[in-house]
Amino acid sequence: MQTLDSSEDADLELMFAEIRRYPLLTADEEKVIDGKKWAAVAALSSVFAEVDDLRATLADLLTNALECPPEVKRFPSREQHFTLRRELAPYFSDGNLAQTATAGARSLRKRASSKRHEKAVQDLAIPASLTVGIAVFMLRRAGGQFSDAVADAIGHWSRHWLAPPAPFALEPEVLKAVRRALREYTEARDALVMHNLRLVHSISGRYRGRGVGYLDLVQEGTLGLIRAAEKFEYSKGF
């Protein structure tokens, strides 16, 4: 029978103490927090459409997704490659949004009104986690820093694009807007995760002693919870 050693016991006590600080959310609280998350995503999408360099970078990313998709041998780990493919798959040449990606890349490169550019970005239906990853990738091209696994993967992939992306400078107000939206998104997503983390521990406890370590189960469950928090849309009920 599997037992926990003293170090695992200590780790669990710390985790349980942290979890107790975050009660389950009411429906209204969840709605408010999720609303902040999606407002931040919308703000990033608007910046993509409004700023020439960001618009061009998004167009380049779409073109490369269609013509130069990421190959596993180009990445330091299979996990990083999988992370990016999972996000980009709809925009590959055989993906269900391939035609939208083609049209979007073309529209974003054209001189047009801000409304047309914003519609082109909206039509792409970029998921929250990919929107954030692209934003962090763009921020890094401009000399900024922010932690994000999807952006890490895009960075590795971009070294093998048809034409490697060049760095660019962003106006201070643009940098401020991007950083603010990233911070607000991360805070909202993390709040959804922390307030639901006790559910992960509860489910993991049911499988305790079945050949997989409890802490490993918690880790896997937490990763799944983060993914769910990124996708969750309160307005749709899932």
Residue ranges and their predicted role:
Residues E8-F238:
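Alpha-helical promoter-recognition and RNA polymerase-docking modules of transcription initiation factors
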Residues M1-D9:
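Charged, compositionally biased N-terminal leader segments and the immediate start
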